[in-house]
């Protein structure tokens, strides 16, 4: 989860600066770290301990903001852009990228039964496993739209959309790099929720060679234009 300053996606900023997918450094791996300390079954979850853990990162407004989030990521050994942070935010039902409120933290960490760094590190495999479950991944993908958008906007700006799509689909969708290139040169400056939802459906149902693409289907114009653009490129 990118650390968001002035409500701007850090991943999106990186993509805009680097100018393309090849240089958009989005990680699904943890930085090198010592193994998490084994937690014995006798160490039960403590709400008091969880709250004290929250205050290690929260500011005077009782919110973990950009600076606290950077320290939190450093302590747990995960880059802010790591997809684990997106899954964690989903589990905490966090509303805004780069911020955890006290209520979100306590509710989410209670659900995960985590009241310290080591317990959360021991949950990393579980958090990753949510990405392999079709239903959970769909929920995470849909959650990412509202999580990443500026709250005064109904759509995602296209740079943020490209970065979040790279995070979520970049390693699994064979056509992703082509779709990314299409978005790079397209007229689109935002992506709305319907388009966002349909990109996932398209990636799951349409073959990489587009052989089963239905021109009369109810796809958004954005995807119709992508298919047309891709076919023209292939023909030339």
UniProtKB/Swiss-Prot annotation:
Entry comment on modification after translation: Phosphorylation at Ser-40 is independent of cullin's interaction. Phosphorylated in response to both TICAM1 and MYD88 dependent Toll-like receptor (TLR) pathway activation. Phosphorylated in response to IL1B stimulation.
One Pfam entry name: Cullin_binding
GO molecular function term, any single one: ubiquitin-like protein binding
Principal subcellular localisation of the protein: nucleus
Stored InterPro entries: DCN-prot (IPR014764), DCN1-like_PONY (IPR042460), PONY_dom (IPR005176)
Record's subcellular location: Nucleus; Cytoplasm, Cytoskeleton, Spindle
Single biological process term from Gene Ontology: positive regulation of protein neddylation
A GO CC term attached to the entry: spindle
Residue span, DCUN1 domain: 45-231
Post-translational modification Phosphoserine, affected residues: 9, 40, 47
Superkingdom classification of source: Eukaryota
Keywords for this protein: Cytoplasm, Cytoskeleton, Nucleus, Phosphoprotein
Keyword flag Cytoplasm: yes
Function per UniProt: Contributes to the neddylation of all cullins by transferring NEDD8 from N-terminally acetylated NEDD8-conjugating E2s enzyme to different cullin C-terminal domain-RBX complexes which is necessary for the activation of cullin-RING E3 ubiquitin ligases (CRLs). May play a role in DNA damage response and may participate in cell proliferation and anchorage-independent cell growth.
Oligomeric and partner information: Part of a complex that contains DCUN1D5, CUL1 and RBX1; this interaction is bridged by CUL1. Interacts (via the DCUN1 domain) with the unneddylated cullins: interacts with CUL1, CUL2, CUL3, CUL4A, CUL4B and CUL5; these interactions promote the cullin neddylation and the identity of the cullin dictates the affinity of the interaction. Interacts (via DCUN1 domain) with UBE2M (N-terminally acetylated form) and probably with UBE2F (N-terminally acetylated form).
Entry text on domains: The DCUN1 domain, also known as PONY domain, mediates the interaction with different cullins. The DCUN1 domain mediates the interaction with the N-terminally acetylated NEDD8-conjugating E2s enzyme leading to the NEDD8 transfer from N-terminally acetylated NEDD8-conjugating E2s enzyme to different cullin C-terminal domain-RBX complexes; the neddylation efficiency correlates with the DCUN1D5-cullin and DCUN1D5-E2 interaction affinities.
Protein name: DCN1-like protein 5
Annotated organism of origin: Bos taurus (Bovine)
Gene transcribed to yield this protein: DCUN1D5
């Amino acid at each position: 989860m990118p650390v968001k300053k002035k409500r701007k996606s850090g991943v999106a900023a990186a993509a805009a600066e680097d100018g393309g997918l090849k240089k958009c450094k989005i990680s699904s791996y943890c930085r090198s770290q010592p193994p998490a300390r084994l937690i014995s079954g006798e160490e039960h979850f403590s709400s008091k301990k969880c709250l004290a853990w929250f205050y290690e990162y929260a500011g005077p407004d009782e919110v973990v903001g950009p600076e606290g989030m950077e320290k939190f990521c450093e302590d747990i050994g995960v880059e802010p852009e790591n997809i684990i942070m997106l899954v964690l935010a989903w589990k905490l039902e966090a509303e805004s990228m780069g911020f955890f409120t006290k209520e979100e933290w306590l509710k989410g960490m209670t659900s995960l039964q985590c009241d310290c760094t080591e317990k959360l590190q021991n949950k990393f495999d579980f958090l990753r496993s949510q990405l392999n479950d079709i239903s959970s991944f769909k929920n995470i993908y849909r959650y990412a739209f509202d999580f990443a958008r500026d709250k005064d906007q109904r759509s995602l700006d296209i740079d943020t959309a490209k970065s979040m799509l790279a995070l979520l689909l970049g390693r699994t969708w064979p056509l992703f790099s082509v779709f990314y290139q299409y978005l790079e040169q397209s007229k689109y400056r935002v992506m709305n929720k319907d388009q966002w939802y349909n990109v996932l459906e398209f990636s799951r149902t349409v073959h990489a060679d587009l052989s089963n693409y239905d021109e009369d289907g109810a796809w958004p114009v954005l995807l119709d234009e992508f298919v047309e653009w891709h076919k023209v490129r292939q023909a030339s």
